[in-house]
Swiss-Prot record:
Family as reported in the entry's similarity comment: Belongs to the PsbZ family.
Keyword presence, Chloroplast: yes
GO biological process, one term: photosynthesis
Protein's organism: Guillardia theta (Cryptophyte)
NCBIfam families (UniProt xref): PS_II_psbZ
Membrane topology, from the record: Multi-pass membrane protein
Position of the signal peptide: none
Gene Ontology CC terms: chloroplast thylakoid membrane; photosystem II reaction center
Protein name per its UniProtKB record: Photosystem II reaction center protein Z
Chief location bin: plastid
Lineage: Eukaryota, Cryptophyceae, Pyrenomonadales, Geminigeraceae, Guillardia
Cell compartments where the protein resides: Plastid, Chloroplast thylakoid membrane
Keywords associated with the record: Chloroplast, Membrane, Photosynthesis, Photosystem II, Plastid, Reaction center, Thylakoid, Transmembrane, Transmembrane helix
Length: 62
C-alpha cells in the first residue's frame, strides 16, 4: 500500500514539474497556445484527478 502511494506521489511530482516548466513556455511562444490549449487543459485535469486519487488513497494508508 505504501509503495502505491509513493508511486502516485512520484507521478504527481513529475507531472507538476512538467506543468510548471511547460505551461509558461507554451504561453510565451507565439501561436503555441492555440495549438496546445487542449493538451494544457487535459494535463491540468489529469493533475487535479491525480491529487484527488492520491488524497483518497492516502486516507486508506494512514
Amino acid at each position: 500500500m505504501v509503495t502505491i502511494l509513493q508511486l502516485l506521489v512520484s507521478i504527481l511530482i513529475l507531472l507538476s514539474f512538467a506543468l510548471v516548466v511547460g505551461v509558461p513556455v507554451i504561453l510565451v511562444s507565439p501561436g503555441e497556445w492555440e495549438r496546445s490549449k487542449n493538451l494544457v487543459y487535459a494535463s491540468a485535469g489529469l493533475w487535479f484527478g491525480l491529487v484527488i486519487v492520491t488524497a483518497a488513497f492516502n486516507s486508506f494508508v494512514i
